[in-house]
Curated annotation (Swiss-Prot):
<dbReference type="GO" id="GO:0010417">
    <property type="term" value="P:glucuronoxylan biosynthetic process"/>
</dbReference>
<dbReference type="GO" id="GO:0009834">
    <property type="term" value="P:plant-type secondary cell wall biogenesis"/>
</dbReference>
<keyword id="KW-0333">Golgi apparatus</keyword>
<comment type="function">
    <text>Probable beta-1,4-xylosyltransferase involved in xylan biosynthesis in cell walls.</text>
</comment>
<dbReference type="GO" id="GO:0000139">
    <property type="term" value="C:Golgi membrane"/>
</dbReference>
<keyword id="KW-0735">Signal-anchor</keyword>
<feature type="transmembrane region" description="Helical; Signal-anchor for type II membrane protein">
    <location>
        <begin position="89"/>
        <end position="109"/>
    </location>
</feature>
<keyword id="KW-0808">Transferase</keyword>
<feature type="topological domain" description="Cytoplasmic">
    <location>
        <begin position="1"/>
        <end position="88"/>
    </location>
</feature>
<dbReference type="GO" id="GO:0042285">
    <property type="term" value="F:xylosyltransferase activity"/>
</dbReference>
<dbReference type="InterPro" id="IPR005027">
    <property type="entry name" value="Glyco_trans_43"/>
</dbReference>
<dbReference type="GO" id="GO:0015018">
    <property type="term" value="F:galactosylgalactosylxylosylprotein 3-beta-glucuronosyltransferase activity"/>
</dbReference>
<feature type="glycosylation site" description="N-linked (GlcNAc...) asparagine">
    <location>
        <position position="366"/>
    </location>
</feature>
<dbReference type="InterPro" id="IPR029044">
    <property type="entry name" value="Nucleotide-diphossugar_trans"/>
</dbReference>
<keyword id="KW-0812">Transmembrane</keyword>
<keyword id="KW-0325">Glycoprotein</keyword>
<dbReference type="GO" id="GO:0045492">
    <property type="term" value="P:xylan biosynthetic process"/>
</dbReference>
Amino acid sequence: MVSSRRNTGGIQRDGSLRDWSEFVDPSPSPKLLYSQSYVAMRGLLSSLVSMDFALLSSRLKSAWAAILSQRHTRSPERSKSRGLSCKRLAFHLFVCFMVGIFIGFMPFFSVDVSQKIVSENGRLPFDEGAVDRGMVDGKVKELETIVVEKEVDIIDESEVEESPPVPAMLDDEADFVESAPAIPDINDLDITVRKLLIIVTITTVRPQQAYYLNRLAHVLKTVQSPLLWLVVEWPDQSFQTAEILRSSGVMYRHLICRKNTTSVRKIAVCQRNTAIYHIKKHRLDGIMHFADEERSYMSDVFEEMRKIRRFGAWPVAIHTGIKYRVVLEGPICKGNRVTGWNTIQNIQKKSAVRRFPVGFSGFAFNSTMLWDPERWNRPPMDSVIVHSGGRGGLQESRFIEKLVKHERQIEGLPEDCNRVMVWNFNLEPPLLNVPPGWSLHKNLDAVIPVT
């Protein structure tokens, strides 16, 4: 029985080995083919199948011994492989680091260095060290200026006559050169700079307004530019005045004075001060003149105004109202220097004594005196306006005293003040019954019918 069990056990072991050998992968192991641990584990599994405990214990011992021996044999191999992998990783990191540095310092655009910047030894200035870009730009500008100066000197020299002859041009080129207009020199151009004339006119809606404004507009239209016409109306902008200014052909500004009063003198003061405030606000630089619409002007007086530096005056012909007598009021001059005054005070005994006996239509001044007192050595807080107090010409005289202190500061116009260019004739009738705007909305009755 014992022998039969052993034979059957041996037979089962052989069969078990054959059965397990059928499931073994015949492909070689990637690391170690049929190592000792592999053989031990194979025997262990075969003993488990055969259920032989004595053989199983021996197989376990041999498998354990094989595993221990494999650990001892693999430990130096693993340490060597780990060392090789660390070195390889460090080498890769070093290579990547160097490539990154190289890319970081590589310029992304081409630097164009001028060939003119060359040192004495024939080398570029950045061969020996860092270059200051500002210094390089300065050297480039210096070299360019030197080259331009040398070219100008070469052109200015008398040796230009020895230059080689100019090659002959084609017929088309010759025609083009002859037809091209020559550019004149700037010194040959006849350019005259004229001062701005600021003409202030006060007006109100009344029957003779259209006549006065149109007459003055035609005179101003003949004056050479630049000219600005400041028309100040009370109390509102009327359609009639706006139409006259729009059709005048003169550059204008339509201002209004809204003072609530019925005094003609106070209304005129408000209108003139409105124009003065407008000039101060916008800092208009020119020659300012109060041109009343009732006055008759020659266009020559406006051209004479442009000669004024600070303050200028001229004689005015005034109708006194005594029969047909006309008196000249204004300065007496020797050249352009004022030596005395003509006045109507001898005719009108009741008139007050004036420091400067001249009306608004007889003087003009530089508008910067209104808003730039430091330029004319005047107190900064001394405001120049027209005051409502004063009759018989005192209003104009007090206004002039704000601008000048002595006749030496006044320029007489024209030369020797021997020409009358302004007339003051009061020809306006007291009352007229006229249609508004001098426009007829319906036909009048026929005085002489057509038969």
